[in-house]
Amino acid sequence: MVKAVGIDLGTTYSCVAVWQNDRVEIIANDQGNRTTPSYVAFNDSERLIGDAAKNQVAMNPYNTVFDAKRLIGRKFEDAEVQADMKHWPFKVIDRAGKPAIQVEYRGEEKVFTPEEISSMVLIKMKETAEAYLGGTVSKAVVTVPAYFNDSQRQATKDAGAIAGLDVLRIINEPTAAAIAYGLDKKSEGEKNVLIFDLGGGTFDVSLLTIEEGIFEVKATAGDTHLGGEDFDNRLVNHFVQEFKRKNKKDLSSNARALRRLRTACERAKRTLSSAAQTSIEIDSLFDGIDFYTSITRARFEELCQDLFRSTMDPVEKVLRDSKIDKSSVNEIVLVGGSTRIPKIQKLVSDMFSGREPNRSINPDEAVAYGAAVQAAILTGDTSEATQDLLLLDVAPLSMGIETAGGIMTPLIKRNTTVPTKKSEVFSTYSDNQPGVLIQVFEGERAKTKDCNLLGKFDLSGIPPAPRGVPQIEVSFDVDANGILNVNAADKSTGKSSKITITNDKGRLSKEEIERMLAEAEKFKAEDEAAAATVQAKNGLESYSYSLKTTLSDNQDKFDAADHETLSKKVDEVISSLDTMQSASKEEFESLQKELEAVANPIMTKFYGAQGGAPGGAPGGFPGAGGAPAQEEGPSVEEVD
């Protein structure tokens, strides 16, 4: 039986893990890396995902897509989307109010939704797991930031469907990290644990009580738009200004230069976690100008001061909401690559009167680790370590409906344990009102205009009655994924109307998901065809060059005419290879057959003259075999 996996779908990096042999295995990708960049690139001939995509980003900035998690489930006019677009070299367009990414692939313009890009990263993680487990992987638990709203969760689930995965559960990243921390600490009594999760693009804080395998989230807070990418942006802006000062030139208009600078900034940021100063050296960055500079840790901290400080607000909010004071928090666990920044560690430590945070779990892998444990539990693949484990998570935002005067009336308050169901009775606002419009919002503000509209629907056919008489029962039902279903019923007629919140037309329809799934299959077939073509080309190239080597090493042993015929053919093939950039697999194969037709008789004759072919002739030459003549056994002399 092939197992269900846990996938941490990150803004900048993703990670996949599986529960096997009574423990979690983090699965390395084909490059041997335990995390994979959440990058997808398109070029004239192929699609690249992961390390291969990130490695070529400077050469192909407009068609390399990353940060899809900062777009997923959002509206095009969101302030964050508009701000991010200034930093991205790829083109984001407005498609029916939602952001979509426009790239050039195989010479034509293509538009992808953030769900499709995320699904490509998920496919890469799925293939990584399949290579390791040796079978098809179809079930997964996928993680999201705890502060993701309903539409972002739903869109992530859709991305899983497009990738051909049955998403067993969407779980919150800090909760998954808490499992990684607490799995082996069952017998230690009740503990209050604060998870501080600062990744590449999102930030969450959750406070949990862990006792005997029960992980109960008391409160959660965060910012779905704060992470390492924002620190990189500050560095990039700083150096763009410095370059302008020194050279009177603005490199921000050049996507390739900006990308090379960003890569250097990301590297510098990492170095500054362990060194007090680092240098940046980029040859010919812009207009042929070399850019050599340095930056200290203190300067970096100053550039990001407000962002670093802002991470403390959610910590205070979680302590307030959970009514647990600082001194009662037993452990502070740091998760996410950005928690390696010394200033962040110091701020957290100072917040808890100088206590050192717990560093017992790997900040890059903890989330996938916890997701893998949850995947094992949901598929019944339990063992002693996981059998009594219970997760009780919460809804991150209040959810409710709009009542007269644009007031937000919450039915489910934030930090309510999910799954949960709440009902309330409402009535009509005017006499003989034939129907009501139920508008569903999420958020903490008093007026709905300041909250996020999740969806709306009509309940019609209410019998005429004075205002306030009809009784309309509205029920909110939040499932274990944190996704909301709403039902409204007129108690007198029993008429009801319900929706699964589909984010104000924002959600992909079943048909769209099926179309994207079919497209994903098509892309996969194209990727495989491209790989087969490369293989055919490489095979022909190595065959040609090994023939060439044999010809030049044994010039005197060949028949002169044969030598000339074959040399001419080999040179002809080698020069055609240089011009056959976009040839098909079949073209390479027919060229190989053509070359073999000339080479085989000549090489057979050559080896015959030598007394047998050397073990394995060039390029896997057919008819290879015998040992070289001089080694045909000991020579015997006749003795008188």
Swiss-Prot record:
Keywords: ATP-binding, Nucleotide-binding, Nucleus, Stress response, Transcription, Transcription regulation
Source taxon at top rank: Eukaryota
Protein name: Transcriptional coregulator SSA1
InterPro entries, sorted: ATPase_NBD (IPR043129), Heat_shock_70_CS (IPR018181), HSP70_C_sf (IPR029048), HSP70_peptide-bd_sf (IPR029047), Hsp_70_fam (IPR013126)
Segments for region (Disordered): 606-640
NCBIfam families in the record: PRK00290.1
Quaternary structure annotation from Swiss-Prot or TrEMBL: Interacts with transcription factor HSF1 on chromatin.
Gene Ontology CC terms, in alphabetical order: cytoplasm; cytosol; nucleus; plasma membrane
Stated role: Transcriptional coregulator that functions together with transcription factor HSF1. Positively regulates the expression of laccase LAC1 during glucose starvation.
Subcellular localization: Nucleus
Coiled-coil region: none
Disruption phenotype: Abolishes LAC1 expression and activity during glucose starvation. Abolishes laccase activity during calcium stress and iron stress. Severely decreases laccase activity during copper stress. Melanin absent from cell. Decreases virulence in a mouse intravenous inoculation model of infection.
Entry GO MF terms: ATP binding; ATP hydrolysis activity; ATP-dependent protein folding chaperone; heat shock protein binding; protein folding chaperone; transcription coregulator activity
Record GO biological process: chaperone cofactor-dependent protein refolding; protein refolding
Transmembrane segments: none
UniProt family annotation: Belongs to the heat shock protein 70 family.
Biased composition (Gly residues): 609-626
Listed SUPFAM superfamilies: Actin-like ATPase domain (SSF53067), Heat shock protein 70kD (HSP70), C-terminal subdomain (SSF100934), Heat shock protein 70kD (HSP70), peptide-binding domain (SSF100920)
Keyword Disulfide bond annotated: no
